[in-house]
Amino acid sequence: MTNEEKGCVRSTKNLRVCVSGGHCDGKDPAYVEECYKMGAKIAKMGFRLDYGFSNSGVMGAVARGVLDNWRERQDKYYGDVTPIVGVTTREYYELYEKDEVLQQISEVVVEDTLENRKIKLLEADIVVFAPGGVGTLDELAYDCVAMQDGFLKTKPFIIYNVNGFFYHILEYLKVLAASGFASPVPFIVVDDSEERETAFRLLRMRYNNCADAREAYANARQLAYELPYFLKKKTDSSVHVEDIWAEMKEIEASGGEEQKQALASEIEQAYLEKEIERMYDRLAKTGRDTAIVSDKLTRLKQRKKKWK
């Protein structure tokens, strides 16, 4: 079996990031602004963008972010490799064929059906869901089913929860899992550009150290739990993510039992604090009952007493 058949990730250079999002701007200007920044960061980190070949809305913003920032890094990261792969169908391609922005995308894959388009996009290493409409929701549902049923190589899914956009969907997915209709999907939820960049950096390091795609997925599951710890450490000490990672790996590999327990407690505390912060934010935006938040807060207080 070849490395490609195993889903092995050989190098972090030019990791492919698939972004799914809306072809409209949405009512909140932050959707387009944040997704343009995401495109810029994809280029600056030397990643490649796989997306649905659109020049408008959220998707157009991501593409412009990449195109506006990749040339200054062409020699270092890209060489002759195009920074964007547009994946579309014949009908959609003909709508945009003469578009000034899209003509800058030198690699375009034209599939026969929307189904094949989705399958092609899922060849990326990382999948990001940005604010969008029913098309984005369709791709999110399709990707979850494909991965859980074994038709898709396991890989990290990032939810870019700009201004709480995905709160309702995340709650619905939790209800499905709790009701026994679906397995929980370990989405890496990021709320802003700092969290998104931290997740990208950690995934890049994890890909560099994993043997195959299944291990990358397991790492992503763990990252969903550990991410708040990295964010908190960055805020408290202004150190680089890579240094925090190295310190964590050192403790896990050769630290004493007390050090390991202290690290585990810090990670758990940061995770619970982030969950509570996110739940209060969700309540403010959706008006949901506070019972769940109260329960989480009680658990956190109990654990803090134990840690002391």
Each model region followed by its residue ranges:
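Glycine-rich, charge-decorated loop segments at or immediately adjacent to ligand/cofactor-binding or catalytic sites
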Residues: 56-64, 165-177
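Short amphipathic alpha-helical heptad-repeat segments
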Residues: 265-280, 296
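C-terminal amphipathic helix plus adjacent low-complexity
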Residues: 203-236, 242-247, 261
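Glycine-rich beta-alpha loop segments
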Residues: 4-85
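Short, acidic/small-residue loops that bind anionic groups at enzyme active sites
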Residues: 77-79, 83-88, 130-131, 139, ...
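Charged, low-complexity interaction regions
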Residues: 232-241, 254-260, 283-294
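A charged, well-structured terminal subsegment
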Residues: 179-219
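Acidic/glycine-enriched connector segments
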Residues: 53-131, 135-136
